[in-house]
Amino acid sequence: HIGVDKDSGLIHSVETTSANVHDITRAAQLLHGEEEVVYGDAGYQGIEKRAEMAGKSTTFRVAMRPGKRRVLPDTPDGRLLDLVETAKAHIRAKVEHPFRVIKQQFGFQKTRLRGIAKNHCKVNVLAALTNLYLARAYLLATG
């Protein structure tokens, strides 16, 4: 699970869990506390109701479930809701780009069973390298 800055596309937090842990259970650890708006896929439905999110002034914009989106009516309101979901998806795509770099540029396709601590270290190093890779143009321009 990673937290990505919406403007820069850089990874700001990493949580490594086993595959059977749901995304929403680690959402609080991905937030650094200064977020105004958080975008999530449909797996984060109901995040604002969770106890660990109580008292936060963050606005959550979570995707509609695919089944609900598929049956939106072909009316002006339905088309507007579909456009809103498309806009949310464009912003959420920023989170997927670092995964592409980790998988394609650094070849981290599958995780071997080494223990959660070793895998956590490897993912953290890959996240740092991904940030350097994504910020390379800015870093080279600044000298």
What residue spans do the PLM features occupy?
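Polybasic low-complexity intrinsically disordered regions
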Residues: 1-57, 65, 120-131, 137-138
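Intrinsically disordered, low-complexity and often Lys/Arg-enriched segments
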Residues: 140-143
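Helix-centered, glycine/charged polyanion-binding patches within enzymatic domains
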Residues: 32, 36-37, 42-117, 121
